[in-house]
Each structure stands twice: as structure tokens, then as C-alpha cells.
A protein has these predicted regions:
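Gly/Thr-rich phosphate-binding beta-strand-loop-beta motif of the actin/hexokinase/Hsp70
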Residues: 48-76, 174
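Extended, charged alpha/beta regions that create polyanion-binding interfaces
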Residues: 1-50
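Short, ordered loop/turn segments at secondary-structure junctions
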Residues: 59, 72-73, 81-82, 115, ...
């Protein structure tokens, strides 16, 4: 009996535990990846605003709010920084700038990133009086900083810094979430729990399939699509 007990404790028990633990990890991985893919799908298939003239805002306190004005195709027409919040508190100057830009570039909608100072920036924007009806949206910033530092963004905007590129990405996400988000490695969009703990090969495969199926579902306008949508 002693020998059997010893053999069980020394040999069998550890191998059963290892196997059980591996099975549990696999199950947990599958579930986490399923949730991650579902979240990504929701983000990619968010309803696009379409071809409208958009102002993109990457909000901030000390560093100011980066403003970009985009035409209906998402091309950058203008960029500047305003400081409506502490510590600079240049509120009235910032308000004048915003109202002027909305009029000058005939802006139809404003996209505000959901990061630092987002709520205060939304309040600031909605409390101004404009010469037109404006839609104001708060947009997920996840992955925008990854995009703005990427080769893709550098190729498109070589003469602008990362903050301007980030604001452009926020504005474009409102116009066409799918077209903008496919430029970013899906794992960087940050819509999953424990994404660094799960099997990375499985995760990549699942996310690639999700992106592909969303692009196939929505279809692609060959005249306006970027190479990221077509590959």
C-alpha cells in the first residue's frame, strides 16, 4: 500500500495536476479570446458617420487639446492646439478658436477622444454657440497612440507629430471605424481582458479572422479604401 501511495504522490498526482491545469488554462484562453474577438467585432462594426466634415479632438490638460479639421474624405485641412483647461485656462481664446474653425471649415460633427480631460472638453465644446447644427461624439481612443507612432501614420503624415496624427485617427474613427481601426494591430486596440496572458498564436488567428469577416461583411469601396482594408 505504501509503495502505491508513494508512486501516486510522486508520479501520478503531479502529472494529473499538470494536465488538469493545462486543460483549465486552455479553456480560460478560449473564453478570453472569444470575448476579445466579440468586443473587437463590436468596435469594428460601429455605425460609421459617413463622409462628413469632422473636427477631431485629442483632449488634454497641460499639453492642451489637439484639434484637427478633416474634409469629408478624412484628409487633414488644419491643425492647432487650444488650452481651455487648467493649468493654462485660456478658455475664451480657445472658445473663439473653436467657433471660428467650425465656421471656416464648415464642420458637421466633432469627435472627442475618451482619454484624459474628455468630459471637460465635451462640456467646453457643447457650451459654445455655433453658426450651424453640430453633432458631438465621444470616441474610443484605444490604439490611437499606437497608430500615431506607427509607420503607417508616419508615411501618411511625415511632417506632423504624433499628437496631430492621434487627433486625425480619432476624427476618422467617427467617419469610418472599420477603415481606421484596420490600420492598427488588433491586439493594440485593447478591448480584451488578460490579452497578454493568453496563447498569442491563437489570439492573433482569432482577431485576424474577426477583422477579415467584418471587412467581408461590410464590403469595401475600392475608390476610397486604404491598402490596409484591401490586404
Amino acid at each position: 500500500g505504501e509503495a502505491v501511495r508513494d508512486a501516486y504522490k510522486r508520479l501520478l498526482k503531479p502529472s494529473i495536476e499538470t494536465e488538469f491545469s493545462a486543460l483549465s488554462k486552455e479553456k480560460a484562453d478560449e473564453e478570453a479570446i472569444r470575448v476579445f474577438a466579440g468586443n473587437l467585432r463590436q468596435l469594428l462594426l460601429a455605425p460609421p458617420l459617413g463622409q462628413k466634415r469632422v473636427m477631431g479632438i485629442d483632449p488634454g490638460y497641460r499639453t492642451g487639446c489637439k484639434i484637427v479639421c478633416l474634409d469629408a474624405q478624412g484628409s487633414l485641412l488644419h491643425n492647432e492646439t487650444i488650452y481651455p483647461h487648467p493649468p493654462k485656462n485660456e478658455y475664451s481664446q480657445a472658445a473663439r478658436s473653436i467657433v471660428k474653425l467650425v465656421e471656416q471649415y464648415q464642420i458637421e460633427a466633432i469627435a472627442i477622444g475618451n482619454g484624459t480631460a474628455s468630459r471637460e472638453t465635451e462640456q467646453f465644446i457643447t457650451s459654445q454657440r455655433y453658426d450651424r447644427e453640430l453633432q458631438v461624439f465621444v470616441v474610443s481612443e484605444d490604439g490611437a497612440s499606437i497608430y500615431s507612432a506607427s509607420k503607417t501614420a508616419r508615411d501618411e503624415f511625415p511632417e506632423y507629430d504624433v499628437t496631430v496624427r492621434g487627433a486625425v485617427s480619432i476624427g476618422r474613427r467617427l467617419m469610418d471605424p472599420l477603415a481606421e481601426l484596420v490600420k492598427i494591430d488588433a491586439k493594440s486596440i485593447g478591448v480584451g481582458q488578460y490579452q497578454h496572458d493568453v496563447d498569442q498564436t491563437l489570439l492573433k488567428k482569432s482577431l485576424d479572422q474577426t477583422v477579415e469577416s467584418c471587412v467581408n461583411l461590410v464590403g469595401v469601396n475600392l475608390n476610397t479604401a486604404s491598402r490596409h482594408l484591401l490586404t
